[in-house]
Amino acid sequence: MTYNQTRSQEAFEQARPLMPGGVNSPVRAYKSVGMTPIFAERGEGSRVYDIDGNEYIDYVLSWGPLILGHRDPVVTKAIQEQAEKGWTFGTPTELETKMAELVIDRVPSIEMVRMVNSGTEATMAALRLARGYTGKTKILKFEGCYHGHGDSLLIKAGSGVATLGLPDSPGVPKELASHTLTVPYNDLDAVRVAFEKYGDDLAGVIVEPAAGNMGFVPPQPGFLEGLREITEQNGALLIFDEVMTGFRVGYNCAQGYFGVTPDLTCLGKVIGGGLPVGAYGGKREIMEQIAPQGPIYQAGTLSGNPLAMIAGYTTLSQLKPEHYEEFERKADRLAEGFTQAGEKYNIPHDTNRAGSMFGFFFTNEKVTNFEKAKSANLEMFRSYYQKMAARGVFLPPSQFEGLFLSTAHTDEDIEKTIAAVEATFKELQEEFSL
């Protein structure tokens, strides 16, 4: 195999003195996989092309937003037409209302919605709303669940924080961190203990209904139902962070897929069609507490801007229930291919999937929480990642991130990926003497 990264290496060297780590988001530095970042030049459908001329089947999809693949022609045309009219005005547009109607129609928990500019903004605003609505202070989250980089949520977070081996972030005051409780994901007993001790001051529970930032880890049967019951019994709000799972796991998001309705939902990624968007919404009586209708303040200069609204609206409008049936079929085939290759070459493996999200761990232990995710062989993942990139498969450069499918991925793409996995696992068997 010949794999050239000459131009990417040069571009990274140029970037490093100008931006912290040479990147604008930590995981893009590729530190955990020990290689030069892949500098993208263009995308088309299920493919991304780097500045060295390498072509990849893309399972990153800009970390999830591109559910229709790169440069979907309908979305591209809609963005171009809106850009001719203007891209931000600082006053309402009809597009915001159309987008709100669509989101409310699709998401079971949302009766009113507020648009913001990122998933982090959405989760921060949802926590403020939960505290303001309940009059309580503390929030319960789960180890390994990442809810953006807001101070009160960078406590035992997953994703890039897990990749860097940092349990928390410097700069988060201990006094602020003390308002955030953490328990293991999929552990209802631990949740009950937390409520027994702090229930009078717990404003809410925030959870990824299917965790995507410790690798991909779905909820165990009864876990989400248990959270719904416990929060209702204790007067706390249940907040689903569906920034990643929203419109990815199912047509009606993860809450529709798993059949559990929260009080508040945070959205992002897919709802922007690849442009910066976030949103939070929920029961009308709760959302009516947001300014200017209520006393809880939240605002944003570019919130609901027409370019993001048209990209998101056009993306969501194209998604139909049958697309999710195809996602299930293709993700199932991908999981089957990984599993068969793992068994054939004696590679430790565990696979998880739901809708268009897929996860693979280099461990024989069934991964149900962050501690088990951390048992994965990171040295093996590092070698695997480099070999797969050289074979033209673009994966998230972290063991603690999930993979994404798009409507542009074909059966041929899936089979090519499985063939690359087979060849890579064969080499790993020899490299690690398995």
From Swiss-Prot:
<dbReference type="GO" id="GO:0042286">
    <property type="term" value="F:glutamate-1-semialdehyde 2,1-aminomutase activity"/>
</dbReference>
<comment type="pathway">
    <text>Porphyrin-containing compound metabolism; protoporphyrin-IX biosynthesis; 5-aminolevulinate from L-glutamyl-tRNA(Glu): step 2/2.</text>
</comment>
<dbReference type="GO" id="GO:0006782">
    <property type="term" value="P:protoporphyrinogen IX biosynthetic process"/>
</dbReference>
<comment type="subunit">
    <text>Homodimer.</text>
</comment>
<dbReference type="InterPro" id="IPR015421">
    <property type="entry name" value="PyrdxlP-dep_Trfase_major"/>
</dbReference>
<dbReference type="Pfam" id="PF00202">
    <property type="entry name" value="Aminotran_3"/>
</dbReference>
<comment type="similarity">
    <text>Belongs to the class-III pyridoxal-phosphate-dependent aminotransferase family. HemL subfamily.</text>
</comment>
<dbReference type="GO" id="GO:0030170">
    <property type="term" value="F:pyridoxal phosphate binding"/>
</dbReference>
<feature type="modified residue" description="N6-(pyridoxal phosphate)lysine">
    <location>
        <position position="269"/>
    </location>
</feature>
<keyword id="KW-0627">Porphyrin biosynthesis</keyword>
<dbReference type="InterPro" id="IPR015424">
    <property type="entry name" value="PyrdxlP-dep_Trfase"/>
</dbReference>
<dbReference type="InterPro" id="IPR049704">
    <property type="entry name" value="Aminotrans_3_PPA_site"/>
</dbReference>
<keyword id="KW-0963">Cytoplasm</keyword>
<keyword id="KW-0663">Pyridoxal phosphate</keyword>
<dbReference type="InterPro" id="IPR015422">
    <property type="entry name" value="PyrdxlP-dep_Trfase_small"/>
</dbReference>
<keyword id="KW-0413">Isomerase</keyword>
<dbReference type="InterPro" id="IPR005814">
    <property type="entry name" value="Aminotrans_3"/>
</dbReference>
<protein>
    <recommendedName>
        <fullName>Glutamate-1-semialdehyde 2,1-aminomutase 2</fullName>
        <ecNumber>5.4.3.8</ecNumber>
    </recommendedName>
</protein>
<dbReference type="InterPro" id="IPR004639">
    <property type="entry name" value="4pyrrol_synth_GluAld_NH2Trfase"/>
</dbReference>
<dbReference type="GO" id="GO:0008483">
    <property type="term" value="F:transaminase activity"/>
</dbReference>
<dbReference type="GO" id="GO:0005737">
    <property type="term" value="C:cytoplasm"/>
</dbReference>
